[in-house]
């Protein structure tokens, strides 16, 4: 009996031991499974990018020129084949005397204009004398009302004792030949020097008679002064136009050998104020579209100044709300200009920017001026009509003997 009882107790002890052992095995299995799942999760997290790849730095060798990302945005696209109202392009160089753009058969130029509703193009760089005459004979005379040409000043004669009188006579001759305005390149105030080595400032008194003569003749002066703000900063990894400047190093005006952008514009603005009876077109949105507060002050202060946006679609298009407010406020002072050669797609890109509310699309020439996109302004019809042609007609209507472009 005692032996049986003892055996029962042993059996009971073994049973309990087996139970604890099973429980231990089950717990161990659960812990092992949890650890395995955790490791699997960590591995999964590594795979979907929660941790940097070990060779990430090694892979950062893609050249900037080869980086061409395709936006994944799904936004409406409204292509505008023809401008809503006919256009006067006040800033072009097609078939000019300087050869700024590649020469194009005049018939093809007219075809592009007809296809896009561009009525008249102003060829700014006509030079003077025989070179001016060639532009007039090729582009102006055969196509009445479709082209106008502006003359230029011969700055190589700046040191002549009678420079002012000679240039006034040259200007009078240009207008007699058919020139309808005067174009001034950015060299004045930036790189042009007299024989003493002194920089010729835009408000140099020797030039005053020329500006005054333009007022007397009733012709506007289209003037390009300075360049984008980034051109006056170091060409380094912080410059938003780095790619453009390494491709065109002569466009960089950073360094002690150049005057500051601000000083050049200040001289130009003093000149504007000194000649209130002459109409000036401050090209490229007064050459500070990055600073529309400055342009606003200029227009508020000087009623004899107009602006246009040639080659500055990129700058204005990336600040759509600010730019739209500006265009609405100064709708009587802004004219349509391109400064981008002659191309249907170029004009249509500008129309899309002005007429639609499309978002995040390429400016014309992207990424030449910088790696950003632009946004449409969807301007009201009354504003579009002024910018497309009415403002230009008001200014160019001052010309004597000009064909009725309406």
Enumerate the predicted regions with their spans:
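Bacterial N-terminal signal peptides that target proteins for export
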Residues: 2-21
């Amino acid at each position: 009996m005692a032996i049986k009882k003892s055996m029962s107790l042993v059996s009971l002890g073994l049973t309990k031991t087996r139970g604890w052992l099973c429980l231990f095995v089950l717990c161990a299995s659960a812990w092992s499974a949890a650890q395995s799942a955790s490791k699997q999760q960590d591995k999964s997290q590594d795979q979907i990018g929660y941790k940097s790849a070990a060779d990430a730095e090694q892979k950062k060798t893609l050249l900037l020129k080869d980086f061409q990302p395709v936006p994944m945005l799904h936004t409406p696209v409204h292509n505008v084949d023809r401008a809503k109202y006919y256009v006067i392009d006040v800033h072009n160089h097609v078939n000019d005397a300087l050869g700024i753009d590649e020469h194009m058969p005049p018939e093809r130029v007219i075809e592009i204009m007809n296809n896009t509703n561009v009525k008249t193009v102003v060829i700014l760089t006509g030079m003077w004398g025989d070179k001016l005459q060639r532009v007039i004979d090729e582009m102006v005379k055969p196509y009445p009302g479709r082209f106008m040409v502006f003359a230029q000043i011969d700055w190589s004669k700046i040191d002549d004792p009678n420079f002012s009188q000679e240039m006034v006579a040259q200007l009078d001759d240009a207008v007699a030949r058919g020139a309808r305005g005067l174009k001034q390149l950015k060299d004045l105030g930036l790189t042009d020097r007299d024989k003493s080595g002194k920089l010729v400032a835009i408000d140099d008194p020797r030039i005053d008679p020329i500006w005054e003569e333009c007022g007397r003749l009733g012709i506007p002066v289209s003037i390009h002064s300075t360049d984008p703000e980034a051109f006056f900063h170091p060409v380094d990894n912080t410059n938003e136009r780095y790619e453009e400047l390494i491709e065109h190093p002569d466009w960089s005006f950073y360094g002690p050998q150049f005057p500051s952008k601000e000083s050049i514009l200040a001289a130009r603005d003093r000149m504007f104020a000194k000649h209130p009876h002459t109409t000036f077109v401050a090209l490229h949105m007064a050459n500070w579209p990055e600073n529309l507060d400055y342009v606003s002050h200029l227009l508020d202060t000087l009623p004899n100044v107009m602006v246009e946006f040639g080659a500055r679609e990129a700058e204005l298009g990336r600040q759509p709300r600010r730019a739209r407010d500006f265009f609405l406020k100064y709708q009587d002072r802004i004219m349509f200009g391109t400064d981008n050669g002659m191309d249907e797609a170029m004009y249509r890109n500008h129309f899309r920017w002005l007429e639609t509310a499309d978002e995040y699309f390429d400016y014309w020439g992207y990424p030449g001026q910088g790696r950003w996109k632009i946004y449409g302004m969807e301007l009201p019809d009354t504003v579009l009509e002024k910018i497309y042609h009415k403002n230009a007609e008001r200014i160019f209507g001052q010309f004597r003997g000009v064909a009725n472009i309406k």
